[in-house]
A protein has these predicted regions:
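Catalytic cores of secreted/periplasmic lytic hydrolases that degrade extracellular macromolecules
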Residues: 2-138
Length: 138
């Protein structure tokens, strides 16, 4: 196996972490009245498909900041729920477009809007793999 092949295998495995979170994303989105595709796109963009240091060490898939830097979460699902609540809070303040959300969410909002938009398009086009539930054996 080449180094490149090994790297691609690791990146694919990390990307599948986000895909495996789709049920949690959908549930949190429905509970908070936000778009699950937007949530997944933010998570993929902010965490570089779950490969970022914050995603791996702090379960912070969404780049959510606290008072002392990036927040630490007990689980990735807890971060997903926090993101849904944050987006619902933005919506309640009239921030509904990507540009409006980006101005509150990050400092480099033009880059963020392009990245999140690209992920949203790929998710909606089915270019991001869906994880199928395991079939019980026996």
């Amino acid at each position: 196996m080449t180094i490149l092949t090994g790297l691609m295998m690791v990146l694919t495995a990390q990307s599948e972490i986000v895909t495996a979170l789709r049920p949690a994303i959908r549930e949190a989105a429905a509970k908070n009245g936000v778009d699950p595709v937007l949530m997944e796109a933010i998570i993929r963009h902010e965490s570089a498909n779950a490969t970022s240091s914050a995603a791996r060490r702090k379960n912070n898939l969404a780049g959510i900041m606290g008072r002392r830097g990036q927040r630490r979460y007990e689980s990735k699902e807890a971060c997903v729920q926090d993101l849904a609540e944050l987006l619902a809070k933005y919506r309640s303040k009239g921030r509904v477009t990507l540009v409006q959300i980006s101005r509150a969410y990050c400092s480099s909002h033009q880059h963020w809007v392009r990245g999140v938009s690209a992920y949203m398009a790929n998710i909606r086009a089915g270019k991001v793999k869906e994880v199928k539930p395991e079939t019980p054996k026996g």
